[in-house]
Amino acid sequence: LPDGEALQDEEVTLLQGVLGPAFQRGKLGDVGLQTIGQMVTDQKVALGRVVKGHKVGLTSKAMRERTGATEPDYGTIFDNWFVDEGSQVSMSTLNTPLVEIELSFVLGADLGGPTVNAVDVIRATEFILPPVEVVDSRFSKRGLPGVVDSICDAASCGFIIVGGNPVAPGDIDIRHVGGALYKNGVIEESGTAAAVMGNPINSVAWLARKLHEFGVHMEAGHTILSGSFIRAHPIA
């Protein structure tokens, strides 16, 4: 929860309803995870934050194997997480920062429902931008969080640096978009967008269907992070 914010009585009751049965079962389950994530979102919005999009993570086989996840994770993106290209970010504000490269879909129309497919994503997308995502867990423990922690924590989103040069989805073969991560002038890793569920369009469609299960949909103007096509690398 945001620093200094206490849970309201109704939120405590809601958490009890989620965590009590989860303790008995030994697992939270999707509904419990989404409930906690939505409570955090509601707290942030109450403090003046604005929902600016959603993200899906662990979309590559390499990242799922690294974290032990069986499916992608997901979370909400807020306005204060966007950083201008070329800006400096203080490391003192970060906990366990990692960096990823991926594609973001900026929507020109609402997107949601149980049957969203690749065609729906293409029709709803106004343009695509290349972002760098700084992944950062708000949990005190070091290393990559588990999928339970991650979903409760907005899929471990820290900051987003969105590049320029917007491209319409029909102007490129998205699967073949490549990227390389440099650190101090040395390539750490490179990859192509096809590593993201075969095509990042598929990950956005998956996310739209997943969010629909909890009554959430993507809105026109939202930025959707489709998932990294390389492993997450430490900044330091």
Predicted feature locations:
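Short glycine/threonine-rich loop-to-helix capping motif typified by GTGT followed
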Residues: 66-69, 230-236
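Catalytic-core "active-site belt" of small-molecule-metabolizing enzymes
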Residues: 1-4, 15-22, 26-199
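Conserved metal-binding segment of the jelly-roll/cupin
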Residues: 218-231
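Extended mid-to-C-terminal alpha-helical interaction segments
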Residues: 211-215, 219
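Buried hydrophobic packing segments
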Residues: 40, 162, 204-211
